[in-house]
């Protein structure tokens, strides 16, 4: 049964009262708006005659009742607008119910209103709407958090708890307008990138999200099962291999913005569902791709911010090209002080041990090099930097380096210590590609759960011939973090993945006593806990059974000893 707060109970009563007055709290009719608050604030002073008959809709966000007249604020998708409402204007007849009862008593903060009237300037110079007609469009039965701002813009009692904000993004967007700006910027970033690609004549495409073979990246997939076909399928970890099939099919350039899924950990820069852009262009190599990426990101930054140097945390990042280029081996030599270029797997394990880097037996040479790089190099790459020329074991889909044996033509772009982009000169030799896949199968047999699977259909496509090509992947979420100066990926995702929400549990007085003791020490010996609680045998048994049944505590038996702990 739903437990309602006092305000929620009152709002439901207000809803019933509105219906008794013949007012539908949720009317079906459209309300044809003809202006936004942003338009009014931007253009009113120069186009006053255009705002004599306007219709605007949005949430009621504040209200100051002063007898037969009141001021308030309405918030639409673009911002807020003050309005002035008089009883006799919206109630020209003798019946003053709409103002005296509906507006003053039955409306609440968060209700959606449709207002009609004209714009004027108050004596204090504030652009405002003089309301002549008011329509209730939707009644809110749950109160919004109260966010108070002083004259200097300081926020008090704000809706600021990160977990609540991410779970209830709909509330976050309503009461924290700067959050909406982040997502508007995200949309603009994607639009600018798409425009750049289209201007170059490359085709936007769509490829399968459900795939029979999880390929194109080193990551753990999410698996599912197709009942009709009776076969396992995977949510894609990358779209690379399908895009390359289209290059085989004759397209000179294809790109895709899409969701990828990786069944891995969550942290400040990782979400199991994320957005990536991948592009493949025929007759190009990774050197050309570096120049293209510089031009792309420089243009996007300029369009979004009007400049190429922007703050990221406490640093200033300059996205104007050209970017620094450093080979992977040289970067490890510079920041870790060791030359790994000639080390075999055994030597790399010794190096990891000396550097206090944890590794396991499933890791081959490429993974070991990558572990050293991640631990000792990444955090130092603040300004945009290309790390190039990776060990062949790390990248089974990239072409062998044209001059350096044992390496492949690959680069990753790092900014502020994080990888933003990944690109190759694409491997188009089907024999070499098959051998690389076979090496991946050997790693999988050793227990490497990030090893790639064999994709026979992709190999068949390569056998028909693929032109020399270069491919690129950019993490849209991380790029957005940079260009909006956000420190966590959750801030740039409307609905990030969250752990299951813990439900509030009602506890008896005896259960609360035990719970409070376990908050101080958990786990604890069952016998010791019983002594501390000092409950009678029956009350103790009922309370412990209740806590276990509600999922609050668990008992662990080891031999003759029994301990009690809180459930995480």
Predicted regions and their residues:
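Short acidic, hydrophobic short linear motifs in intrinsically disordered regions
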Residues: 523-533
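Class II aminoacyl-tRNA synthetase catalytic cores and aaRS-like
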Residues: 1-505
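Alpha-helix C-caps/helix-loop-beta hinges
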Residues: 116, 200, 521, 550-551
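Short, cationic-aromatic polyanion-contact patches
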Residues: 504-511, 525, 555-568
């Amino acid at each position: 049964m739903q437990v309602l707060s006092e305000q929620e109970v009152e709002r439901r009563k207000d809803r019933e009262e509105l219906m008794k007055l013949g007012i539908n709290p949720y009317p079906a009719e459209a309300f044809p708006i003809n202006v936004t608050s942003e338009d009014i604030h931007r253009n009113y002073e120069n186009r006053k005659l255009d705002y004599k008959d306007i219709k605007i809709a949005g949430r009621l966000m504040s209200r100051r009742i002063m007898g037969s007249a009141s001021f308030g604020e309405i918030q639409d998708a673009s911002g807020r607008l003050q309005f002035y409402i008089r009883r006799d204007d919206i109630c020209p007849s003798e019946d003053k119910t709409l103002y005296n009862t509906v507006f003053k008593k039955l409306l609440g903060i968060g209700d959606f209103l449709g207002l009609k009237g004209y714009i004027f300037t108050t004596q204090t110079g504030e652009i405002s709407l003089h309301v002549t007609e008011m329509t209730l469009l939707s009644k809110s039965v749950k109160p919004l958090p109260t966010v108070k701002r002083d004259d200097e813009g300081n926020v008090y009692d704000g809706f600021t708890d990160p977990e609540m904000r991410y779970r209830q993004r709909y509330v976050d967007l309503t009461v924290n307008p700067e959050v909406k700006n982040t997502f508007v910027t995200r949309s603009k970033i994607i639009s600018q990138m798409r425009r750049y690609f289209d201007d170059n004549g490359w085709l936007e495409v769509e490829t399968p999200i459900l795939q029979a073979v999880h390929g194109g990246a080193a990551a753990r997939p999410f698996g599912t099962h197709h009942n009709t076909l009776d076969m396992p399928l995977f949510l894609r970890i990358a779209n690379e291999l399908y895009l390359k099939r289209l290059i085989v099919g004759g397209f000179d350039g294809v790109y895709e913005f899409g969701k990828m899924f990786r069944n891995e950990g969550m942290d400040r820069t990782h979400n199991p569902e994320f957005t990536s852009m991948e592009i493949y262009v025929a007759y190009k190599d990774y050197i050309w791709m570096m120049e293209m990426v510089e031009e792309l990101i420089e243009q996007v930054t300029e369009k979004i911010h009007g400049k190429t140097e922007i703050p990221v945390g406490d640093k200033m990042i300059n996205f104007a090209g050209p970017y620094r280029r450093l080979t992977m081996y040289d970067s490890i030599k510079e920041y870790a002080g060791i030359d790994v270029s000639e080390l075999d797997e055994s030597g790399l394990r010794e190096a990891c041990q000396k550097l206090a880097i944890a590794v396991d037996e499933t890791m081959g040479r490429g993974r070991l090099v990558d572990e050293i790089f991640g631990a000792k190099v990444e955090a130092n790459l603040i300004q945009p930097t290309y790390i190039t020329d990776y060990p062949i074991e790390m990248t089974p889909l990239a072409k062998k380096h044209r001059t350096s044996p044992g390496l492949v033509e690959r680069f990753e772009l790092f900014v502020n210590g994080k990888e933003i982009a990944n690109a190759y000169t694409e491997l188009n030799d089907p024999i070499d590609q098959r051998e690389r896949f076979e090496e991946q199968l050997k790693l999988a047999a050793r227990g490497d759960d990030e090893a790639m699977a064999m994709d026979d259909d992709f190999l068949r496509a390569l056998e028909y011939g693929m032109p020399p090509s270069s491919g690129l992947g950019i993490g849209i979420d991380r790029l957005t973090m940079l260009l909006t100066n956000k420190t966590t990926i959750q801030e740039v995702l409307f609905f990030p993945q969250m752990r299951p929400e813990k439900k509030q549990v009602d506890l008896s007085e005896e259960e609360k006593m035990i719970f409070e003791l376990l908050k101080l020490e958990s786990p604890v010996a069952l016998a010791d806990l019983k002594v501390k609680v000092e409950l009678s045998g029956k009350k103790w048994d009922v309370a412990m059974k209740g806590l276990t049944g509600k999922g609050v505590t668990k008992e662990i038996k080891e031999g003759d000893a029994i301990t009690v702990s809180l459930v995480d």
